[in-house]
């Protein structure tokens, strides 16, 4: 049984607080409480008929990630953990996140209702360093939560590829091969993957479900196939 110290966070909107607690509750429910075979993590975005937006995910990892809840206020000065040439910013929004191995933000929500979820993707290839600033993958989700209120804002910024992501080896010796899903309070969604050294973005409300491998374009193709053979009934 894992124990978590819940931080006190003062967000102005009660509705956002309820959504935050529900989303984090769903995330924590997926964390492994005992050793078990690894299965695929899944992120799901649901918009109810009354407009309520909920993002949930399972964390089907092969070991205890020693996760904790971290609460960050707005105004924190940060850098991307990439040495001398790394992005530097000051957080515009407060956030609550679930840590991974206590070295980075695996997922979370900011005070505007923007949610970020990192899932494993074996096909990730971040490319070669090319002189751009370098951002550690442990700060990728936090970079988004700190600076953007909506999915559209994040997409507009990240599609410019202002940095290169670097992925150090995890404490268990595995590579940190991840893709990023984000959603906001309106139900908008985007998926970010590095495939063949290039950033690929899928942006739209229809991208509501993401799992691990294969890459997201192939996940969409598989979904289309199963719909044609009665897999949705």
Ranges and model annotations:
Residues 2-22:
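Bacterial N-terminal signal peptides that target proteins for export
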Residues 19-33:
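Bacterial N-terminal signal peptides
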Residues 33-39:
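Signal peptide processing junction and immediate N-terminal pro/mature segment
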Residues 155, 166-174:
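Surface-exposed patches in mature extracellular/periplasmic domains of secreted proteins
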Residues 171-225:
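Extended amphipathic alpha-helical segments with heptad-repeat/coiled-coil character used for oligomerization
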């Amino acid at each position: 049984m894992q124990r978590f110290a819940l931080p006190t966070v003062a967000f102005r909107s009660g509705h956002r607080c309820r959504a935050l607690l529900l989303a984090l509750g769903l995330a924590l429910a997926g964390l492994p409480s005992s050793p078990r075979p690894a299965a695929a993590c899944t992120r799901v975005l649901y918009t109810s008929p009354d407009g309520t937006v909920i993002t949930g995910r399972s964390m089907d990892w092969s070991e205890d990630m020693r996760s904790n809840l971290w609460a960050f206020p707005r105004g924190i000065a940060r850098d991307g953990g990439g040495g001398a040439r790394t992005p530097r910013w000051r957080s515009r929004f407060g956030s609550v996140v679930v840590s991974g191995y206590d070295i980075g933000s695996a997922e979370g929500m900011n005070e505007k209702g923007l949610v970020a979820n990192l899932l494993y993707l074996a096909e990730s290839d971040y490319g070669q360093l090319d002189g751009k600033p370098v951002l550690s993958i442990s700060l990728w989700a936090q970079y988004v939560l700190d600076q953007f209120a909506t999915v559209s804002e994040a997409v507009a910024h990240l599609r410019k590829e202002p940095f290169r992501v670097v992925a150090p080896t995890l404490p268990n010796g595995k590579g940190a091969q991840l893709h990023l899903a984000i959603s906001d309070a309106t139900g908008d969604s985007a998926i970010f993957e590095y495939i063949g050294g290039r950033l690929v973005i899928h942006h739209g409300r229809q991208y509501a479900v993401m799992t691990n491998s294969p890459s997201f374009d192939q996940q969409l193709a598989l979904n289309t196939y199963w719909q044609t053979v009665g897999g949705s009934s």
